Design a protein with these regions (language model features):
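Glycine/proline-enriched, intrinsically flexible loops and inter-domain linkers
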Residues: 2-91, 99-118, 122-551
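Glycine-rich phosphate-binding loop of nucleotide-binding enzymes
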Residues: 94
Length: 551
């Protein structure tokens, strides 16, 4: 171990230690992935793992985890510590919650944390969050009118007590869900992940001859904070304003007002003027609002420094209490991603006025659309299966947007084979959508088309979580908007975009996903790239002539 005169770690040692802490979070994530039961975790990547110091501040997160999870988990741990002070934790304890106001903003996400001891001294905490395959109540949906309809709410409570299951808590959870085996399997996978994280941290401290993480966490978080401050200082001081509208629920369209104020090395995001909270599940609690505000700033201004607690210290996020971005309890919030995922677009709409070379156009992948199917499969087993699929990312300042990429979330689509293996559903089509990317000097990412047939003997329940039907992803600096989303049945009927319904045997659901917005004037696009797009089937000949003037 190498220290300088100030008792700081030298840069080489710090980089080695930082990389190893990230690898610990990655190994924890691999354990969760490999031992989970549900496809939502092992196929769609809807989970995250975080290593935190003894104060509950984040040190490292798994590569490719859900961005909001790593941003929120330290906040949730501090709520755990408020109920269970540090001196009361014992080796093997595991505290759990899914309270939206304390954790990730909706009930399906379950947060767990365990203490890490070395030589009887508390040196840190491991944490994991995973989207449960079921949490009771309604299906994952947007049409509930208050939190109590949306499922089981678990207050902070010990799931394990000194390594032993708290059977009463386990029984309470499993007695309120449709898929108890899968739910318990995923909960145990989270416990396994947390234990792996703890073991590997102790090994790291032994190998590094460190008594604890105190100096290292101070140094790592300080470096991350300074990197973010340096990046913010490159943005001209000023207040930058943008708005964004979304479909909302029925007549309650969502309007987001955003002012990004930069002063020196500090950045403030203020959502004053945003729509009030509604009695449908689109409300986004402040934890989630903060996470999906800070993350796009990090992506734009300081994308390469690994994230930890220090990355967020220069960023302040405020939203009016009672707004859709800071609702009062017990507002419904089950589909909060349909609002929270939009924040990157409006933040970039503000920052493009100051640093156009650092931001992307609005993304059709935000918000991510979901279709939730539930019923009984031919073997007589209850199932709930979620189709994860994405629209296109917004175009970049010097690059086309990525097709069908889940920005700002990292949830994956998963394989069709896995999707079909647990439910009486057949996917007949899953392909890129021609002409869906917004035209520009750099084209928006393509959306996709999916067609799914019900092969059960009985009706299934379907919950749709979608947006961008009326408000497509916007282009910037002369770029055109991407194509909007659309959902319909094979008989031509159009379902409610955010509600539950029954779907009959033999019915086919056709889902069309939005494209990303374009960046820059389409007439500035290299004609050779337009012709390549036509050749590859991304852009039709008619659109090439209409939007780009290329034939």
């Amino acid at each position: 171990m190498a220290l300088n005169a100030k008792d700081d770690f030298d840069p080489v040692t710090l980089e080695i230690f930082w990389s190893r802490l990230i690898s610990i979070a990655d190994e924890s994530a691999a354990a969760l992935l490999r031992t989970s039961f549900s496809t939502i975790v092992r196929e769609s990547n809807d989970f995250g793992t975080v290593l935190m110091d003894a104060n509950g501040d984040s040190l490292s997160e798994n590569t490719g985890g859900i961005p909001s999870f790593s941003g929120i988990l330290p906040t949730t741990l501090k709520h755990f510590l408020a109920k269970y002070p540090k001196e009361t934790w014992k080796p093997g304890d595991c505290v759990i919650t899914n309270d939206p106001w304390l954790a990730t903003g909706h009930l399906p996400d379950i947060t767990m944390s365990m203490p890490i001891f070395r030589n009887d001294k508390l040196v840190g905490f491991s944490g994991s969050i995973a989207h449960s395959p079921d949490i009771g109540g309604s299906l994952w949906s947007a049409d509930c009118r208050e939190l109590y309809e949306e499922g089981l709410r678990i207050p902070p409570i010990k799931f394990l007590v000194e390594g032993e299951p708290n059977q009463d808590v386990e029984d309470m959870i499993l007695g309120n869900v449709r898929l108890p085996d899968q739910v318990l399997g995923d909960l145990n996978a989270q416990v396994t992940a947390n234990k792996v994280c703890g073991r590997r941290l102790v090994e790291f401290l032994d190998d590094s001859e460190l008594d604890d993480l105190t100096r290292l966490s101070t140094d790592l978080q300080g470096r991350a904070e300074q990197a973010m401050r340096n990046a913010i200082e490159e943005v001209p001081d000023g207040a930058y304003h943008a708005t964004l509208d979304a479909d909302g629920f029925d007549e309650d369209e969502t309007h987001i007002e955003c002012t990004v104020t930069v002063k020196g090395s500090n950045l403030k995001i203020d959502y004053a003027g945003t729509s009030k909270q509604i009695n449908r599940g689109l409300n986004t609690v402040m934890n989630y609002t903060h996470a999906y505000s800070a993350y796009p700033v990090k992506c734009a201004l300081d994308p390469y420094t690994p994230r930890n607690e220090g990355s967020y210290r220069p960023i302040e996020v405020v939203a009016p209490e009672g707004s859709i971005l800071n609702p009062r309890y017990p507002a419904p919030c089950n589909a909060r991603q349909l609002t929270g995922h939009l924040l990157a677009g409006v933040i970039y709409g503000a920052l493009v006025q100051a640093v156009p070379e650092k931001v992307i156009a609005d993304s059709g992948s935000a918000p991510s659309m979901r279709a939730v199917f539930s019923g009984v499969n031919p073997m007589g087993n209850r199932f709930t299966q979620i189709l994860f699929a994405s629209g296109g990312m917004g175009a970049c300042p010097a690059k086309d947007g990525l097709a069908t990429t889940a920005f700002p979330t990292n949830a994956g689509a998963g394989s069709i084979e896995a999707f079909e293996s647990v439910a009486p559903l057949i996917v007949w089509k899953k392909e890129l959508r021609v002409d869906s990317g917004g035209a520009g000097a750099f084209r928006g990412g393509l959306g996709q088309e999916c067609e799914i047939e019900v092969r059960s003997e009985d009706e299934l329940q379907l919950s749709l979580l979608s947006d961008r039907w009326r408000h497509p992803a916007l282009g910037v600096l002369g770029g055109l908007p991407g194509a909007p989303s659309q959902i319909r049945f094979s008989d031509g009927t159009v379902p409610h975009q955010k509600s539950r319904t029954s779907i009959s045997p033999g019915a086919r659901l056709h889902m069309v996903y939005a494209g990303g917005g374009g960046y820059g004037d389409p007439k500035d696009r290299d004609p050779a790239r337009v012709r390549d797009d036509v050749k590859n089937g991304y852009v039709s000949a008619a659109a090439a002539k209409r939007d780009y003037g290329v034939s």
